[in-house]
Each structure stands twice: as C-alpha cells, then as structure tokens.
C-alpha cells in the first residue's frame, strides 16, 4: 500500500508530521486487526467449540480498539484530520466493515451501534467509488445478484 501511494503520489501525506501520523494509524491497523479477525472472529464465529474466556477476552480488545477509533474521530473527518489517506483505507477495511456489515454476526454482541463516530466515518468511506470497487474483490458472493469478484486479473474485472 505504501509503495503504491508513493508511486502514484496520492493518499500518503508528504509533510513529515502528517506522514508520521498516517503511518502510525497504518501500523496500528497492522497490529490490531489480528485481534479482530484472527482472535475475536475465530473464537466467536468459526471455532468448533465456543469457549467463553477467549471470546470475552478478544471482544474486550476489539471494543477497546473501537473506542480508540471513536475517540479519535470525535473531532475529525478522517483518522488524520480532513484528508482521506491510506490509513483510512486500511483501518476501514477491517473496523468499518465490522460496524457497517455486521461482520461475524457480532454487531449486537459488540454493541457497535454505540461507536457513532466510527459509523459516520465508515459510512462516508464506504460511499467512495474506489472503496466500493475494492470491497467487491476477494469476497465470497452472498447471493445470485452479488457483484463480488472472487479473483481479479484486470481492471475490466471491476466494470
């Protein structure tokens, strides 16, 4: 992602402090998302046996992360202020989809409705045409009229 943002000169701030904040959020996502997908998602939705301790432990961590995001977005349009960048793309792909798409059928369990700022931010990003295209790739179709693209080989796959 960083390579592409640098190569095309978009979505990555060039000013040092703005770039550092963007990279901090990008690396925050890399360090935190495994708790959401690999931890919470696995034990809550996919594990053959349901154990209360890991479900509660990972749920607590996911809620803490949602709280971090919600507080940051309280006075900001995007993660780093007024400008959309790669950190928004990376974080929204996990946490935005959790609050908007009821990932793992856990919206009620995690009380995602209480994270109003995360929802507002995710809704705005989810309306962006490029984000809409990106969420179609490598996702299992949910029905006969679904526009999911299992594998992408060419830009025309998104037409």
Question: Which ranges hold each PLM region?
Answer:
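GST-like domain detector, emphasizing the conserved glutathione-binding G-site
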Residues: 1-56, 60-63, 70, 159
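Active-site-flanking alpha-helical
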Residues: 5, 94-95, 135
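Residues at helix-coil transition
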Residues: 5-6, 31, 74, 100, ...
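Surface-exposed helix-capping loop/turn segments at secondary-structure junctions
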Residues: 10, 71-83, 129-134
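GST superfamily/GST-like fold recognition
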Residues: 36-41, 79-107, 113-120, 125
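Alpha-helical packing segments of well-folded alpha/beta enzyme cores
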Residues: 58-66, 94, 121
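Residue-level signal for nonpolar/aromatic packing positions in well-ordered secondary structure
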Residues: 69, 88, 125-131
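Acidic/histidine-enriched, glycine/proline-rich intrinsically disordered or flexible terminal extensions
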Residues: 135-159
């Amino acid at each position: 992602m960083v390579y592409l943002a640098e190569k095309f000169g978009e979505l990555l701030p060039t000013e040092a402090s703005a770039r550092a904040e963007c990279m901090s959020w990008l690396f925050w996502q890399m360090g935190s998302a495994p708790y959401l997908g690999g931890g919470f998602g696995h034990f809550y939705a996919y594990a053959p046996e349901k154990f209360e301790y890991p479900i509660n432990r990972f749920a607590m961590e996911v809620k803490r992360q949602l709280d971090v995001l919600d507080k940051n977005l309280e006075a900001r349009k995007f993660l780093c202020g007024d400008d959309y960048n790669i950190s928004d793309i990376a974080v929204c792909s996990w946490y935005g989809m959790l609050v908007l798409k009821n990932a793992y059928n856990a919206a009620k369990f995690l009380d995602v409705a209480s994270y109003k700022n995360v929802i507002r931010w995710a809704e705005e990003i989810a309306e962006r045409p490029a984000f809409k295209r990106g969420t179609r790739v490598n996702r299992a179709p949910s029905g006969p009229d679904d526009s999911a693209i299992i594998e992408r080989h060419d830009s025309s796959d998104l037409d």
